[in-house]
Amino acid sequence: MPTKIAVSTFQCMKKIPPGAPVWNQFNASFINRELDTRGIVDAIYSGHPVTTQHKNNWRSSENFICGQHLALDFDSEDNTSTIDYLSNDKFISKYGTFIHTTISHKPEAPRARVFFLLDEPIMQAKNYTLAAAALLWMFGTADRQCKDAARFFYGAPGCEFALLFGILPLEMVKRIIKDYLSSGANELKRTIKKNFTVPTSQEKVSSVAFHPSMGNQLR
């Protein structure tokens, strides 16, 4: 199944230092593609960073077109960040598409990334960010920086990888978001009740703010 993704023309053997002059060139280096799983893995294995699709030849949330992948970084540098451990997680083994060691991985300090390719693309930046945040919430040990709609992921030259070939349905993403927002609403209610006496009408407004109609929210 072709996936909408953007691949950089850069081949990064290591991370680009903050403030490096090359960042502008890098942000303009992503080309919108439609690739199958092996094509994406080949790009990552060759050291090419990937991100969501953008317009105007510039990677930014304002230029977001769509995203058809979600990814989680596991950087604990222990057994829980190994490919073997992650591939045995029930959710990952069912819905994960592939796992690879990251550019910062060391055998004595393992780091890995799980990619979930979606059956349909997410068409709005705010909804992509929400989906990424919800997945992070479900995996409390994942790197919290993975939720930006313009977030890119470095390739990892010569990385180890495991192909799982799972696909994460958009309907499942919506369910995860619903649970994520519900947990936030419940926490807000507990905080309000602990500190204030709030009129029923205001409490309902707060609840609604955390429970948008799912419908076509992700499209």
Question: What do these predicted regions represent?
Answer:
Residues M1-P110, L117-L130:
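Signature for HUH/AEP ssDNA processing cores
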Residues K4, F98-T101, K178-R219:
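Long, charged low-complexity interaction segments
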Residues K4-K14, A150-F153, G158-C159, M172:
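Electropositive, intrinsically flexible nucleic-acid-contacting patches
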Residues G19-S29, L164-M172, S206:
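Short, polar loop/linker segments at the starts of domains and inter-domain junctions
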Residues G47, Y154-P157, R219:
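Short, hydrophobic/amphipathic alpha-helical patches that form generic packing surfaces
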Residues S81-D89, L117-A142, L163-Y180:
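Helical (often loop-to-helix) elements that flank the catalytic cores of nucleotide-handling enzymes
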Residues H105-P107, F116-L117, R144-L168:
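Short, conserved secondary-structure transition motifs
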Residues K126-L130, A150, S213:
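Generic recognition of stable, solvent-exposed alpha-helical segments in well-folded globular domains
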